[in-house]
Amino acid sequence: MSRSLLILDRDGVINLDSDDYIKTLDEWIPIPSSIEAIARLSQAGWTVAVATNQSGIARGYYDLAVLEAMHARLRELVAEQGGEVGLIVYCPHGPDDGCDCRKPKPGMLRQIGEHYGVDLSGIWFVGDSIGDLEAARAVDCQPVLVKTGKGVRTLGKPLPEGTLIFDDLAAVASALLQ
């Protein structure tokens, strides 16, 4: 199972990101080819889980019902392509709330590992920010940076040692399915 578990950040990896937050279902727009990439991985036997910071809830920009609608849309679009999305975990807290789940802390990644009963060592965690990559390193996941979302900006910062870099999630899927 561990070799076939992939963990993804959401905003900037699966869907377009915004510095103003994704606040409505209409603003949740998949990155071209990301839905197909998840479906391809799922069809090949991969479990694709999601770990996403959603501080917009703590900030009052949207509520849990809106977040759940976005995740239902994600699951629906992937299912239409013949795939499945695994566990989706989110941190609803703000940056100053002192929780253990908000990336770069690795709480959400640990939760996914516990859910699937796997050691996270070597599991790929795909993100577009330094926080994603640092969370990956904290639990010995393989940090993977995509150039979508904030990825190009992130390239200008010091990356954790051994970070793999891909153009987008479709390129990650192609590499894993070779």
Swiss-Prot record:
Localization annotation: Cytoplasm
Catalytic activity: D-glycero-beta-D-manno-heptose 1,7-bisphosphate + H2O = D-glycero-beta-D-manno-heptose 1-phosphate + phosphate
Pfam families: Hydrolase_like
GO cellular component terms, A-Z: cytoplasm
Residues the UniProt record annotates as site (Stabilizes the phosphoryl group): 52, 103
Listed CDD domains: HAD_HisB-N
Record: residues binding Zn(2+): 91, 93, 99, 101
GO function terms (MF aspect): D-glycero-beta-D-manno-heptose 1,7-bisphosphate 7-phosphatase activity; magnesium ion binding; zinc ion binding
InterPro entries: HAD-like_sf, HAD-SF_hydro_IIIA, HAD_sf, Heptose_bisP_phosphatase, Histidinol-phos
Keywords noted in UniProt: Carbohydrate metabolism, Cytoplasm, Hydrolase, Lipopolysaccharide biosynthesis, Magnesium, Metal-binding, Zinc
Positions annotated to bind Mg(2+): 9, 11, 128
Pathway: Nucleotide-sugar biosynthesis; ADP-L-glycero-beta-D-manno-heptose biosynthesis; ADP-L-glycero-beta-D-manno-heptose from D-glycero-beta-D-manno-heptose 7-phosphate: step 2/4; Bacterial outer membrane biogenesis; LPS core biosynthesis
EC number: 3.1.3.82
Coiled coil region boundaries: none
Active site residues per record: 9, 11
Biological processes per GO annotation: ADP-L-glycero-beta-D-manno-heptose biosynthetic process; lipopolysaccharide core region biosynthetic process
Disulfide bonds: none
Residues under site feature: Contributes to substrate recognition: 102
Highest taxon above the source species: Bacteria
Entry binding sites for substrate: 9-11, 17-21, 52-55, 102-103
Names of required cofactors: Mg(2+); Zn(2+)
Complexes and interactors: Monomer.
Stated family: Belongs to the GmhB family.
Name of this chain's protein: D-glycero-beta-D-manno-heptose-1,7-bisphosphate 7-phosphatase
